[in-house]
Design a protein with these regions (language model features):
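Short, flexible, solvent-exposed loop/turn segments with mixed acidic/basic and small polar residues
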Residues: 4, 58-60, 233-236
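Bacterial N-terminal signal peptides
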Residues: 4-15
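Hydrophobic alpha-helical membrane context
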Residues: 15, 117-118, 217
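Gly/Ser-rich catalytic/binding loops embedded in alpha/beta enzyme cores
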Residues: 22-207, 225
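Fold-level recognition of mixed alpha/beta catalytic cores in primary-metabolism enzymes, strongest
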Residues: 159, 163-166, 190-254
């Protein structure tokens, strides 16, 4: 059911435990390139820790997201979760996404945060549960970094609704040119990857909502075959067309 995640599986560079202090130069270079496999290999080799990586992304969000409005909420447990993945790695864990921060479109339920679909009507909608997709990401070792902005109700409003605008998050901006569209409805997931707020994000698509933001922001994103990824606990539009899928900077990472 989740076979698309196999594309994200990371080949570890070594089997050595983490013993080296954070190399900020290497970390910054890898964040800029955004390749999930390279980042995972560096984590496995002890070039830096998941804690340092997570804090680096959180610092970027704090510094730049006021302009881009890609992020709706940060997981308050993200740094602690990163520390746990460092401990797991030192104990020999080889989970495929171990210690990789991932951002989640805010129409997908996560236990730590409300799921709003960008709408004021759902602003306090905290269900305290994970969608099966999120449970699979956690099982693979991913760190849920936070939730991303989107076209409100995933654009299930009108043909003239603004791409990337929601009453909760405002207007998402395209980091490459804030005057151009970020497209939608997975606008925040796309803008977040383009701004290097995480190496991997999850969007959803009914008709173009992953591929369009990926296209206009220089990313790779794809819509898996409907039914391959569980639709459970994702705010619905169409049972025959809805699916979640990955968005990243390159083919290897997506």
């Amino acid at each position: 059911m989740f076979r698309w995640i196999t594309i994200l599986i990371v080949c570890a560079a070594t089997h050595a435990p983490i013993t080296i202090a954070s190399d900020q130069s290497t970390l910054a270079e890898l964040v800029e390139r955004g390749n999930v496999m390279e980042i995972s290999a560096a984590l496995q080799a002890g070039k830096f820790t998941s804690r340092a990586l997570t804090k680096h992304y959180l610092d970027r969000i704090d510094r730049y997201d006021e302009e881009y409005r890609a992020i709706l909420a940060i997981n308050p447990n993200a740094v602690n979760d990163a520390i746990k993945t460092d401990e797991m790695r030192s104990q020999g864990s080889r989970a495929p996404l171990l210690g990789i921060p991932v951002l989640i479109k805010d129409n997908i339920e996560t236990r730590e945060l409300p799921t709003t679909a960008g709408a004021l009507a759902l602003r306090g909608n905290r269900t305290n549960r994970d969608a099966p997709l999120i449970a699979q990401l956690r099982k693979a070792g991913a760190i849920i970094l936070g939730k991303t902005n989107l076209s409100e109700w995933a654009n299930f409003r009108s043909e003239r609704s603004s791409s990337g605008w929601s009453t909760v998050g405002g207007q998402t901006r395209n980091p490459y040119d804030p005057l151009r569209t970020p497209c939608g409805s997975s606008s925040g997931s796309g803008a977040a990857i383009a701004a290097r707020f995480a190496p991997l994000a999850i969007g959803t698509e009914t008709n173009g909502s992953i591929v369009c933001p990926s296209h206009v922001q220089g990313l790779v994103g794809f819509k898996p075959t409907v039914g391959l990824v569980s639709q459970t606990h994702i705010v619905p539009i169409s049972a025959s067309q809805d699916t979640a899928g990955p968005m990243a900077l390159d083919v290897d990472s997506a």
